[in-house]
Amino acid sequence: MAKEDAIEVEGTVVETLPNAMFRVELPNGHRILAHISGKMRMHFIRILPGDKVTVELSPYDLNRGRITYRSKS
C-alpha cells in the first residue's frame, strides 16, 4: 500500500485487544480494528481506551487500519 493512497481519519480507542490491537470508533459511528505502527511500538507509546488517535485506512479494506498518532490530550 502506497502512503499516498492511505485514508487518514481521527477516532477514539474503545477497547484494547490482545497482540497490540485496538477497537477504534470513528466519528461516523463505524468501529474498526487497528494495530500500532512500527515507530510507535519502537518508542513504547502507550495507548489506552479513551485516547484520540489518527488511523490510516487502506482503500481496499476499510475495516482494518494502522494507528499512526496519539493526540496529546
UniProtKB/Swiss-Prot annotation:
Pfam family, one: eIF-1a
Gene Ontology cellular component list: cytosol
SMART domains to which the protein is assigned, alphabetical: S1
UniProt keyword list: Cytoplasm, Initiation factor, Protein biosynthesis, RNA-binding, rRNA-binding
Any GO MF annotation of the entry: rRNA binding
Record bears the keyword Protein biosynthesis: yes
Domain S1-like: 1-72
Entry-linked InterPro entries: NA-bd_OB-fold, RNA-binding_domain_S1_IF1, S1_domain, TIF_IF1
Lineage: superkingdom: Bacteria
Residues in coiled coil: none
Subcellular location: Cytoplasm
Keyword Cell membrane: no
Family the entry assigns: Belongs to the IF-1 family.
Oligomeric and partner information: Component of the 30S ribosomal translation pre-initiation complex which assembles on the 30S ribosome in the order IF-2 and IF-3, IF-1 and N-formylmethionyl-tRNA(fMet); mRNA recruitment can occur at any time during PIC assembly.
Official protein name in the record: Translation initiation factor IF-1
Organism phylogeny: Bacteria, Pseudomonadati, Thermodesulfobacteriota, Syntrophobacteria, Syntrophobacterales
